[in-house]
């Protein structure tokens, strides 16, 4: 009953008239925006890079096909491509508590180190490159279509005209000014989308 209720299924979009009457959302007129947990952020990158194969519904899950997901890394102690340190660094940076002590609510602090992580750490760079390779492997797409696919895959929505224009400007900068190849240019763009609030927050 709860998950099918109108309250639970609300959008997090801001309505000025309602916000003026209930700025703190005490009456739940919109869905409260919340940041994804550390494990969900990591698994999202993993899935976008094509590292979590789809499995048929109606059958027991084969966990061996999802062994690189965060929950299995944390319980088994193994990690893909020898990046265990970077994965644990990410999980701790975004609020995962390795102590195992139960808490009623995780720390959802926002800090500069998190922003720097998306741009400088080799873990998101690796998965951004894998996603760039997936995008470039899709046949018969022009740049505008490829940008739209990228945004839909990563944040679940198409870019508006101004954002599309800014994206083309950035891609041209990567290609011409920085003299990067196609895969590297698209990987840089994907890193920028990874670092956006639209990727980290559930609306």
Predicted regions and their residues:
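An acidic, gly/pro-interrupted, aromatic-rich
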Residues: 1, 7-158, 188, 193-203
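Short, charged, surface-exposed loops that flank catalytic or proteolytic processing sites
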Residues: 141-143, 176-185
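Short, well-structured alpha-helical segments
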Residues: 148, 160-168
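Amphipathic alpha-helical segments that form the core helices of the histone-fold
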Residues: 154, 165-176
């Amino acid at each position: 009953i709860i998950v099918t209720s109108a309250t639970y299924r609300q959008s997090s979009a801001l309505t000025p008239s309602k916000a003026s009457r209930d700025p703190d959302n005490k009456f739940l007129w919109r869905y409260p925006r919340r940041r994804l947990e550390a494990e969900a952020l990591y698994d999202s990158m993993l899935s976008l890079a094509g590292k979590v194969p789809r499995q048929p519904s109606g059958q027991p899950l084969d966990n061996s096909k999802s062994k690189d997901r965060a929950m299995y890394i944390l319980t088994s102690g193994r990690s893909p491509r020898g990046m265990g340190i970077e994965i644990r660094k990410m999980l701790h940076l975004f609020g995962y508590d390795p102590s195992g002590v139960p808490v009623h609510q995780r720390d959802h602090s926002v800090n500069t180190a998190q922003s720097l992580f998306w741009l400088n750490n080799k873990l998101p760079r690796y998965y951004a490159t894998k996603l760039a390779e997936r995008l470039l492997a899709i046949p018969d797409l022009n740049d505008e279509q490829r940008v739209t696919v990228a945004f839909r895959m990563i944040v679940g929505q198409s870019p508006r005209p101004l954002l599309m224009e800014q994206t083309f400007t950035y891609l041209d900068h990567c290609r011409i000014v920085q003299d990067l190849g196609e895969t590297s240019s698209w990987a840089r763009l994907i890193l920028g989308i990874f670092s956006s609030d639209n990727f980290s927050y559930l609306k």
